[in-house]
């Protein structure tokens, strides 16, 4: 099973830790999440430590990422969304760096595990729910009854809307984990055949692998964007009660 495409997703204990009867061991998943956080902090520290009127390439790239998140919130929520920029920006950067770090050879893709993505999705779900109740009180419950719904159809619509609302963290987490896992499995399988194919096709498989890796990097960035834009849309529902 060493060469199984799924072996790359195995969680391995590095430091065995038990606390109050719970297993809180430091694993390869933990170290890559920590590494992603450190790399993200280092990147933005270097980008903004010595800001100049004529920005460096690093500063420009960091500002582009920041403006991307700010525009997402502005387009979905408006001015009211500005206060959520730090939280949503941190979420986007963490997922982005975890995804990209998983593209490096012999690394570990933390976002391919449903427990990681579900935890992030639950945080978004709780944030949206708390914001909704704090801002609107019990009127937030009107979210589950679309405006203009006939009275006789109200019970069914409430059940459907409630189910849809509760399913948000599930769909949000599954989408990210499934896409990251599928892409990495595909790369692993094709890479396994590359050496054999080179006997018959010479160097043709190499540019194909480069293209596939480039596409997977694009998917890694896209999935971080999708997770974040959906989080902004959910926040908009809670703030503006559409």
From Swiss-Prot:
<dbReference type="Pfam" id="PF00119">
    <property type="entry name" value="ATP-synt_A"/>
</dbReference>
<keyword id="KW-0406">Ion transport</keyword>
<dbReference type="GO" id="GO:0046933">
    <property type="term" value="F:proton-transporting ATP synthase activity, rotational mechanism"/>
</dbReference>
<dbReference type="GO" id="GO:0005886">
    <property type="term" value="C:plasma membrane"/>
</dbReference>
<feature type="transmembrane region" description="Helical">
    <location>
        <begin position="114"/>
        <end position="134"/>
    </location>
</feature>
<dbReference type="InterPro" id="IPR000568">
    <property type="entry name" value="ATP_synth_F0_asu"/>
</dbReference>
<keyword id="KW-0472">Membrane</keyword>
<comment type="function">
    <text>Key component of the proton channel; it plays a direct role in the translocation of protons across the membrane.</text>
</comment>
<dbReference type="GO" id="GO:0045259">
    <property type="term" value="C:proton-transporting ATP synthase complex"/>
</dbReference>
<keyword id="KW-1003">Cell membrane</keyword>
<feature type="transmembrane region" description="Helical">
    <location>
        <begin position="181"/>
        <end position="201"/>
    </location>
</feature>
<dbReference type="InterPro" id="IPR035908">
    <property type="entry name" value="F0_ATP_A_sf"/>
</dbReference>
<feature type="transmembrane region" description="Helical">
    <location>
        <begin position="140"/>
        <end position="160"/>
    </location>
</feature>
<protein>
    <recommendedName>
        <fullName>ATP synthase subunit a</fullName>
    </recommendedName>
</protein>
<feature type="transmembrane region" description="Helical">
    <location>
        <begin position="29"/>
        <end position="49"/>
    </location>
</feature>
<keyword id="KW-0813">Transport</keyword>
<dbReference type="InterPro" id="IPR045083">
    <property type="entry name" value="ATP_synth_F0_asu_bact/mt"/>
</dbReference>
<keyword id="KW-0066">ATP synthesis</keyword>
<dbReference type="InterPro" id="IPR023011">
    <property type="entry name" value="ATP_synth_F0_asu_AS"/>
</dbReference>
<keyword id="KW-0997">Cell inner membrane</keyword>
<feature type="transmembrane region" description="Helical">
    <location>
        <begin position="84"/>
        <end position="104"/>
    </location>
</feature>
<keyword id="KW-1133">Transmembrane helix</keyword>
<feature type="transmembrane region" description="Helical">
    <location>
        <begin position="203"/>
        <end position="223"/>
    </location>
</feature>
<comment type="similarity">
    <text>Belongs to the ATPase A chain family.</text>
</comment>
<keyword id="KW-0812">Transmembrane</keyword>
<comment type="subunit">
    <text>F-type ATPases have 2 components, CF(1) - the catalytic core - and CF(0) - the membrane proton channel. CF(1) has five subunits: alpha(3), beta(3), gamma(1), delta(1), epsilon(1). CF(0) has three main subunits: a(1), b(2) and c(9-12). The alpha and beta chains form an alternating ring which encloses part of the gamma chain. CF(1) is attached to CF(0) by a central stalk formed by the gamma and epsilon chains, while a peripheral stalk is formed by the delta and b chains.</text>
</comment>
<keyword id="KW-0138">CF(0)</keyword>
<keyword id="KW-0375">Hydrogen ion transport</keyword>
């Amino acid at each position: 099973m060493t060469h199984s495409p799924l072996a790359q997703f195995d969680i391995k204990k590095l430091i065995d830790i038990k606390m109050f009867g719970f297993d809180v061991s430091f694993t390869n998943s933990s170290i890559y999440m920590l590494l992603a956080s450190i790399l993200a902090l280092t990147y933005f520290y270097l980008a903004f430590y010595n800001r100049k009127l004529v920005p460096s390439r690093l500063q420009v790239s960091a500002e582009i990422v920041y403006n991307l998140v700010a525009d997402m919130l502005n387009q979905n929520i408006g001015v009211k969304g500005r206060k959520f920029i730090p939280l949503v920006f941190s979420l986007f950067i963490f997922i982005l760096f975890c995804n990209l770090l998983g593209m490096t050879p012999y690394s570990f893709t933390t976002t391919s595990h449903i427990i990681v993505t579900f935890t992030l999705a639950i945080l978004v779900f709780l944030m949206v729910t708390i914001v909704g109740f704090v801002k609107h009180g019990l009127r937030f419950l009107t979210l589950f009854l679309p405006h203009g719904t006939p009275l006789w159809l109200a019970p069914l619509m409430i059940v459907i809307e409630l189910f849809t609302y509760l399913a948000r963290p599930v769909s949000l987490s599954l989408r990210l984990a499934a896409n990251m896992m599928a892409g990495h499995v595909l790369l692993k399988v094709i890479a396994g055949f590359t050496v054999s194919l080179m006997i018959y096709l010479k160097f043709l498989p190499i540019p194909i692998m480069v293209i596939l890796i480039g596409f997977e990097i694009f998917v890694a960035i896209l999935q971080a964007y999708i997770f974040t834009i959906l989080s902004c849309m959910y926040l908009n529902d809670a703030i503006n009660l559409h």
